[in-house]
Amino acid sequence: MADNYVLIGYMGAGKTTVGKQLASMCGKQFADTDAMIVEKEKMSVNDIFAKYGESYFRTIETNLLKEITDSMSGYVISCGGGLPLKEENRAYLKRLGKVIYLKADESDIIKRLKNDNTRPLLKGPKDEVRAKVHGMLEIRNPIYEEAADSVIVTSDKKISEIVAEIIKDEE
């Protein structure tokens, strides 16, 4: 297993924010799979979804994982929320490093994402978004838990507390 922390969880769980601080505290580099895809494809995640669809995006995610699994070491890697959904991807994640599920509750996620219009899966009226988040979490939570080596609940915690919990979990 590589010397990486791999952060998974639903959008708005804090993967990027926690990941950057964790990388800084541990002397590791930070990488974000969505950002890597944007750089490679030369278009935003939103644009990829709009132009080619979710299935195409998920294929790109899998291809990226295949590329980085044995070549990245010394990183904190923030993964797109849907990346662990494919069983094939979960196997790559395990090889990539210690998989940590940052688990936020539904109300926190909705609060954090209410003004974010860069999330292609959360377009629409507020009631529809709430129902969509609820439905997606029902499906994704068990998958995230199965994929994770450890689960860190992020609700009602400061970023520094979450980072400290991850580091303590390693000791």
Q: Where in this protein do the model-derived segments appear?
A:
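P-loop (Walker A) phosphate-binding loop of NTP-binding proteins
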Residues: 10
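ATP-binding Walker
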Residues: 13
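A glycine- and Lys/Arg-enriched "phosphate-lid" helix/loop adjacent to the NTP-binding pocket
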Residues: 96-141
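Hydrophobic anchor at the beta1->P-loop junction of P-loop NTPases
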Residues: 7
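NTP-dependent small-molecule kinase module
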Residues: 2, 21, 25, 139-171
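Walker A/P-loop
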Residues: 16
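ATP-dependent small-molecule kinase phosphotransfer cores
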Residues: 33-83, 87-94, 118-119, 134
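Post-Walker A helix-loop "phosphate-sensing" segment adjacent to the P-loop in P-loop NTPases
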Residues: 24-35
